[in-house]
Amino acid sequence: GHQDCYRYSVLLRALFTMMFGWTSKRFQSLYETGKLDSSLSLEIEINRRFNFLMLTMDTKEPVAISHQFRKAIQNFATDSDVSEEHLDLIKSEIYGEFIHSMNSLEFIATQYQSHSDETTLFDLPKIIQEMTLDDVLEVGHHFIDNSEIVEFTIFPL
């Protein structure tokens, strides 16, 4: 169920990485046309009290990009980047980051601490292995259907 915060956040990260990560067609096209740089980042916080997901980026076209991202999020279930093939790629990417992070005690300590529920960082390989596109879509619906989208634009001085 959705009570398992860690698994939920991993599946949500997979969905948003498919749509907005560097392997997505959307990111590639915005990057190639100079509308986005590599500063695009994704932050997810899922716990028993509140959930949030934050996309941050530098762009010269905040209104257009914001509109495009909002539409993509609303129509995530039919997004061309949300596919079995792309999910397999993202799963490998998440697993690679996991293996890499095992070299960092600090990372393990902070990650281990932030999820005191049933699963931990060490369950990640199993979560990745068992993750299906249907699971990802289900979590996506649960999160997006129950969320408000808020935009902040910070202009340089």
Pin down the residues of each PLM region.
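Short Gly/charged-rich anion-binding patches and loops
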Residues: K25-R26, E138
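M16 family metallopeptidases and their MPP-like homologs
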Residues: G1-H2, F27-T78, E85-E130, E148-P156
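His/Glu-based metal-binding/catalytic segments typifying zinc-dependent metallopeptidases
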Residues: G1-K25
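Bilobed periplasmic-binding protein-like "clamshell/Venus-flytrap" ligand-binding domains
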Residues: L137-G140, D145-T153
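Generic, well-ordered alpha-helical scaffold segments in large soluble proteins
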Residues: M18, A72, V139-H142
